[in-house]
Amino acid sequence: MADDITETSQTVAAGQLRALIERIERLEEEKKTIADDIKEVFAEAKGTGFDTKAIRTIIRLRKKDQAERQEEDAILDLYMAALGMV
């Protein structure tokens, strides 16, 4: 009886593990598809004449809140002033 419970537990654990791995694999495939889509959009932007580096910077900045951006700008200004760049 104890062997049956252990075997059942192992079967359930193996099934759960397999399901988790398959979910991760599907998500990885979706991630790859999305990355390819993003790459295509950047290629389209470049083909239209937009600067993709600037677009990436804007996207990065839009992810941050205003206070965080202001703090980074202040530090950047301070460092540039210290180096005589402004």
UniProtKB/Swiss-Prot annotation:
One of its GO terms (molecular function) is DNA binding. Coiled coil: none annotated. InterPro entries: GapR-like, GapR-like_DNA-bd. NCBIfam families: PRK13694.1. Belongs to the UPF0335 family. This is UPF0335 protein mll3968. It comes from Mesorhizobium japonicum (strain LMG 29417 / CECT 9101 / MAFF 303099).
